[in-house]
């Protein structure tokens, strides 16, 4: 909570509830955090989506988790779901479901990934920091007995506070600075 106070600054508020229309009824939703009055509150599904990527044929690098973690060399595949350098992809199958990777070069996503589409009105590092904040919760609430899958219902329904863009940039910068101190 103190880190949140540090990141938000002096504009703390007592807004820890909001109302949402569900099946035609207005329901009060209790929130895990307090949000400043200048922020709007949405669900993660309103600012990001999991997509399949563009189906393509032709040789390209397979961007699987081992390669993205630098634990294996690149393998070449003939077709797949194409993503571009600078995109973000998220593991949706396996024990590390919810882990996000930046795409280092054009190539084909590994079969355990989805492309993470982020709204252009959002500051990408802010949303990525938000998803990272919930990494353990996403990892520990997987679905499926044989191969666990990302709980997409939980993922899409996470409440996210949306500050003005300049505040998103400041918060993301502060989070980055704090992570540098941890390293």
Name what the model sees in each region.
Residues 1-9, 14:
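Single conserved hydrophobic/aromatic residue that forms the stacking wall/gate
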Residues 59:
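Short aromatic-glycine-enriched beta-strand elements
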Residues 34, 39-43, 78-85, 122-129, ...:
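Generic recognition of stable, solvent-exposed alpha-helical segments in well-folded globular domains
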Residues 131-160:
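Specificity-determining recognition surfaces
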Residues 21, 103, 146-150:
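Short helix-capping and inter-helix turn/linker motifs at the boundaries of alpha-helical repeat units
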Residues 68-69, 79-132, 144, 155:
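A short beta-sheet element
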Residues 46, 115, 157-159:
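Extracellular/lumenal ectodomain signal focusing on beta-strand-rich modules
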Residues 5, 22-55, 67-68, 161-183:
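Non-catalytic DNA-recognition/assembly elements of restriction-modification systems
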């Amino acid at each position: 909570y103190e880190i949140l106070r540090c990141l938000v600054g002096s504009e703390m508020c007592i807004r820890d509830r909001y109302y949402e229309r569900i099946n035609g009824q207005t329901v009060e939703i209790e929130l895990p955090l307090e949000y400043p009055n200048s922020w709007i509150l949405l669900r993660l599904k309103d600012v990001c989506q999991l997509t399949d990527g563009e189906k393509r044929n032709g040789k390209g690098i397979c961007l699987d988790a081992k390669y993205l973690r630098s634990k294996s060399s690149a393998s070449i595949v003939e077709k797949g779901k194409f993503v571009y350098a600078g995109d973000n992809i998220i593991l949706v199958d396996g024990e590390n479901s919810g882990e996000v990777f930046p795409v280092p070069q054009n190539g084909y996503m590994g079969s355990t990934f989805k492309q993470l589409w982020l709204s252009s009105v959002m500051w990408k590092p802010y949303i990525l920091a938000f998803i990272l904040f919930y990494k353990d919760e996403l990892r520990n609430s997987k679905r499926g007995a044989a191969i666990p899958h990302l709980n997409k219902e939980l993922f899409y329904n996470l409440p996210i506070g949306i500050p003005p863009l300049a505040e998103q940039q400041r918060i993301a910068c502060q989070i980055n600075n704090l992570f540098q101190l941890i390293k």
